[in-house]
Amino acid sequence: MDSGGPSTFAFQAEVKQLLHLMVHSLYSEREIFLRELISNASDANDRLRFESLARPEWGSTDPELRILVTVDPERRTLSVTDNGIGMSREEVIENLGTIARSGTGEFLEKLTGDQRKDAQLIGQFGVGFYSAFIVADEVTVLSRRADAPADRGVSWISDGRGEYRIETVERQQRGTTVQLKLKENAGEFLEPERLKALIRKYSDHIAFPVRLAGSGHEEETVNRAKALWARPRAEIKDDEYVEFYKALAHDADGPLIWSHNRVEGKREYTSLLYVPATAPFDLWNREAPKGVKLYVQRVFITDQAAQFLPLYLRFIRGVVDSTELALNVSRELLQQDEAIGAMRTALTRRVLDMLERLAEDSTKYATFWSQFGALLKEGLIEDLANRDRLAKLMRFNTTKTASDEQSRSLEQYLGDAKPDQDAIYFLVAESPTAARNSPHLEAFKERGIEVVLLTDRLDEWVMQHLTEHGGKPFKDVRRGMLELDAAKGAEPKAEKQDRERQALLKRVKQVLRERVDEVRVGGRLRQSAACLVLNEHDLGYQMRELLSAAGHKPPAAIPSLELNPEHALVRRLDAESDPARFERLALLLFEQAVLAEGRQLDDPAAFVARLNELLTDLGTQGAK
């Protein structure tokens, strides 16, 4: 590490790119710099308050935590000062000269060109400090850690063009000051009334007093300095809830719904939970930071309190403020606290209550489902206690939906079911198009029986856990024998045809050998000649791919081939006496069935050759 004297460093390459984008692409949203600097100051105060639990001496001098915004019109400077945790020289270099590698690429890829949305991404990716260069020709940072002596302060100065200068300086005050030398066209941010309006707009909920001083203006507290969630619900307007969410989640869009509750009695805590309208960039990274912000007796503990909600609800944003949890609990020990389990159960129930209310508005719920529906399905696997409630929240694409949108509920399915229907039928496929065109649906379409179409990556795994609903079992239309037309006490039509076609079935089995478990006649097909059928307990194609992707070898599973004896190709096959032509046609029927499943052929070239031979034969016969 450098000695402590004046040193000049070059910004990390990603920082240079980021600074260029901010200065040139976010001009119309430049006021957000103040939101970001005050938010950073609030975080620094929060961290000092937490560290002071174990080290009271850190906050013993100057114990009143606050944020001061100062303007000097003559020097054209605006400063944001906190008396929080502060930074060491090493931390300043690490925090202000580089961006965490994990978020840099994603941030740059997510930029849309929409200045309003991109301005929100700044905070979401933890790069809010750099927004200061949108309005400043030069930025100076003065800081001293709470545990450092006065002669170990640090000064950081940059014009944002590629380099920054850093040196160790004398600083009596704990905490950090960010001073901006404003550009000529940024004079509005020297006006007290403009700054008051911005502070109230973006930082009214900050739990520390935000004070404004300078320009002959007497120092005054501008914000309410009381956490929004700590106020009575009756006093809070909807737009206040929305603005708080936007600041909390760094989201340009408002939430779909929220729930604000105070629990009293044996366990006392307040929760304010939000359902976003759009998914965050790292939604599918189960290892990414997640969870609600946790406060204990108004003391900030962590903004990644994942213990309070199950993983499938990781999209929820919000705050939990408890008086129950021990104040000296560490972030690591928090998950061992016996009160956590009870709070997790109650908060999960609260979220499901919210989603049930949201489902009453089909338009809003469609928005929610398009963003988070696949995630909610994880709950069917992980949350046995709430599986029935979650099942009612599911939405599906079915043979009755006009588009490929997942909009049908299981309650709607059961309400429209045939009087004699004894199961909820479903089909797993690679895509909505493949599902709708599947030969497995032909008998169901003829009878007007609705089939749920499942095309999400986890659907087959989910259906191993969701086995019944409303007293009816789920049945996979790709598995086992299926006979929709059999009258009670009568021999199923497919079984009768199976007996009558035994000679044909044996001949086809001899050709296909180990490719299929069995060749039979079934009740599924009407227009198609053949289809593949899974055995009842074999893993489906989706599950096999998931296991393979995870590095596991799936157990062997050999499908059966089901033929439609009424189809012209099957009749021709039955009448074919030439062994070579019979083998070629039997293989073609099998390969067509594989393709209809959306699967890949082992030898596409051989399939093309057989198809060409068949077409040539047909052409020759037609010419005679």
Where do the protein language model's features map onto the residues?
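GHKL (Bergerat-fold) ATPase N-terminal catalytic module, capturing the glycine-rich phosphate-binding loop
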Residues: 1-189, 197, 418
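GHKL/Bergerat-fold ATPase module in large chromosome/replication-associated machines
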Residues: 121, 139-163, 183-187, 193-624
